[in-house]
């Protein structure tokens, strides 16, 4: 059985990406915040700052967070550095630079550094639009879906990004507390391209020299046994596996997943896809879960057996969720994935 994969992004403009489902996502890079492993107080304060910032994304509903082990491009940087060497010591300097590259690559294979990248789905602005304008736009969207189903595609407006600039600026202001920076069009292309060059040595300048969308996906993806993927590109090949995080501790206090990932001695990408959910849709599920927990507790009491800590903590967590829903607090549903690459 063969699967036809399509690249989801149709067009980009600066840090904005228009996807084929007509949603627009804005991308930002968040600088690392240096915190020592033992500084629990600073970790707690940073988590509060991040939580407060995330609440401001509620109206946008969808967002994703990626912790990316980016190729440090050591050899490329050393080449650039060699241009600054004095003429009378160039030979020695180049020898030392080459020695440094050889030692580090021999030990680490591909030296890397971690980048935090956040993507937020933007809302289209309709300020000043009349009812007639909104009705016309709704009809156009419906017509486009019909045309897409028949294999046709609407012509894209060259200024499609103008309708999203206001919301993008609002999001950028919300991220200012974390010193976020907008991705340039070049950076956005490179981050997209890196997904198909995982753990494959390459020169960034060479990758950026061919920036057509076709060049992003020129990697051949082969599905192997055991849940592995093999990436074959003009630059080399590597193996990738995607591991969904299936179980989290009930109590999140002291749980620093991003920190644990960075402690590993091999590159692992963390990707979190999240959505602010309609709390009205989970009330039925909460009620059924509460009934199930109550029956388990009553059965344990009637049989005079000790209840497992996991069941007790789950019941406490469910009560906490019901309280938050009752107080109309924002609830996020998310999935976390680890992407491991090797050669």
Task: Tell where the protein language model's regions lie, with residue ranges.
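Extended, folded cores of ATP/NTP-driven motor/assembly subunits in large transport
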Residues: 1-343
């Amino acid at each position: 059985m063969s699967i036809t994969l399509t690249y989801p992004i149709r067009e980009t403009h600066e840090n904005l990406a228009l996807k084929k489902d007509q949603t627009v996502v804005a991308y930002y890079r968040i600088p690392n915040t240096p915190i020592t492993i033992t500084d629990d107080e600073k970790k707690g304060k940073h988590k509060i700052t991040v939580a407060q910032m995330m609440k401001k994304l509620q109206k946008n509903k969808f967002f994703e967070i990626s912790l990316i082990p980016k190729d440090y491009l050591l050899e490329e940087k050393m080449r650039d550095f060699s241009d600054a060497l004095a003429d009378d010591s160039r030979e020695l300097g180049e020898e030392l630079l080459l020695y440094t590259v050889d030692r580090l690559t021999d030990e680490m294979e591909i030296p890397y550094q971690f980048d935090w990248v956040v993507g937020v789905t933007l809302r289209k602005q309709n300020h000043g639009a009349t009812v007639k304008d909104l009705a016309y736009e709704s009809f156009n969207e419906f017509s486009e879906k019909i045309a897409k189903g028949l294999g046709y595609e609407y012509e894209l407006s060259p200024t499609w990004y103008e309708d999203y600039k206001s919301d993008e600026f609002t999001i950028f202001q919300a991220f200012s507390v974390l010193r976020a920076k907008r991705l340039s069009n070049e950076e956005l292309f490179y981050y997209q391209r890196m997904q198909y060059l995982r753990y494959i040595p390459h020169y960034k300048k060479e990758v950026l020299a061919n920036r057509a969308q076709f060049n992003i996906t020129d990697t051949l993806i082969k599905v192997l046994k055991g849940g592995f993927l093999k990436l074959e590109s003009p630059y080399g090949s590597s193996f990738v596996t995607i591991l969904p995080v299936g179980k989290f501790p009930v109590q999140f206090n002291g749980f620093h997943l991003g920190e644990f990932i960075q402690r590993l001695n091999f590159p692992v990408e963390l990707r979190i896809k999240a959505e602010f959910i309609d709390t009205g849709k989970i009330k039925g599920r909460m009620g059924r879960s509460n009934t199930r927990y109550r029956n388990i507790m009553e059965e344990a009491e009637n049989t005079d057996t000790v209840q497992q800590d996991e069941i007790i903590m789950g019941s406490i967590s469910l009560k906490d969720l019901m309280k938050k829903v009752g107080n109309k607090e924002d609830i996020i549903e998310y999935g976390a994935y680890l992407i491991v690459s090797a050669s």
